[in-house]
């Protein structure tokens, strides 16, 4: 059975998705787009930001989204920003496929996250994610 692919992204009304770096103005504005998620209890625990946090519907949506995800696909810019910001135990706990031109060996993190670097396009990354999801979740 083929798994479902769903698209999850934060985007401003003018189509802005990811900054060049977190240090520039666009990076700061991008972080403002994300501010709703960081107070959520599930995210605080998953990113090792401390105890407590909000437990409303936003928290449940974040938790449900992470729990139903068997593998993730992301671009190199998202990976680069996350590599600097994520704790040692990256928050995914699943295989992650990074679409990039950079050749790099898989990077395994504590807690079940392994980053795989895919050099031949999004279609290949999606195929690999589907295959990994099936083997990971069985």
Residue ranges with predicted function:
Residues 1-138:
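Portal/gating segments that form or line small-molecule/metal binding sites
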